[in-house]
Amino acid sequence: MIRPYTKLKVADNTGVKTIQVIRVLRGPRVAYGTIGDIVVANVREVLPNSDFKKGDVVKAVVVRLAKEIKRPDGTCVKFDDNAAVIIDQLGEPSGTRVFGPVARELREKGYLKIISLAPEVL
């Protein structure tokens, strides 16, 4: 579950390493986010050659959760870390590569570009 002040790894090649969640854009009075939710976050760690600076406010889509996710067919999926992909104003990923596996739930939420860039979909 992703809440405000949660730190997420960034799973793309934008040069940002970690972000800290400010708000989950899921709806009013929703305290947590899950896979496929958009979060507003603050950039915490960056690489020197990045277009982003420390302290920038960005939007990102959650692509991996350490908490197990129960699917309608009865299977449970969980990942080793919490990770997100930074998106632009149109909802497209800012980077050109996605590192690590992503969840199948992204396809249902309409993030086909992230699915196509990912090396593995679980």
UniProtKB/Swiss-Prot annotation:
Binds to 23S rRNA. Forms part of two intersubunit bridges in the 70S ribosome. Belongs to the universal ribosomal protein uL14 family. CDD domains: Ribosomal_uL14 (cd00337). One of its GO terms (biological process) is translation. Keywords: Ribonucleoprotein, Ribosomal protein, RNA-binding, rRNA-binding. GO terms for molecular function: large ribosomal subunit rRNA binding; structural constituent of ribosome. This is Large ribosomal subunit protein uL14. Part of the 50S ribosomal subunit. Forms a cluster with proteins L3 and L19. In the 70S ribosome, L14 and L19 interact and together make contacts with the 16S rRNA in bridges B5 and B8. It comes from Coprothermobacter proteolyticus (strain ATCC 35245 / DSM 5265 / OCM 4 / BT). GO terms for cellular component: cytosolic large ribosomal subunit. It comes from the Bacteria.
